Amino acid sequence: MKMETTNIAKNDTLKKVIDTYCKMKDSGVLQEVNNWDEYTGSMLNSEVAGVINGCWIMGTMQTAEDQSGKWAITNIPKLTNVKGATNYSNIGGSSWAISGNCGNVELAEDFLASTFAGSTELYDNILSCGAIATWTPAGDSDAYAVPNEFFSGDAVFEKIVDYSTKVPSIITGPYFHEARDAISVATTNITNGADLEKELKKAEDTVNFNMGQ
């Protein structure tokens, strides 16, 4: 979505994504689960050989101490013959915003600029709590270069920040989650045998309805 318009029903790239997803599922390469417990269990119980997710999933993975040295961090596969496709993406994370009701916007801006957008020391201190920054200067910190024993001594935090500099920027818009949910429903139906074109048209109609169009 961009500028509150939908691009679902005739989105050829999205169709390739869903087609690839279906092929992975049908071949057995992709394991589907029904809930979060099954998802984390598939990692902790050695049921899967890899996981495509944001860096925040590392905390869950490292609770399985018996798997230390068996996991690694790398980039992701990309679609071929798709303009702009890369081996880098993101999912989740947090955002900082200043409310329109803020009593001192200038002070709030200065605070954010001096801390989360200006202090590598802050990120060094909170790294041990599992808070990983994708703020580029943080990647130059000595703390981010420390080897991680669970991941075979790899400096995974430094690697993640480097990856983050290569993630394409997108404009999600205020109806991003509505679009995501509609496409998720469509994808589930398609993997179960529903017609791709009809499901994507239905998803687009759903989002347009939510946007009042």
Where are the predicted features?
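Short helix-initiation/N-cap motifs at beta->coil->alpha
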Residues: 31-45
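Conserved C-terminal helix/tail region of periplasmic/extracytoplasmic solute-binding proteins
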Residues: 23-26, 142, 159-213
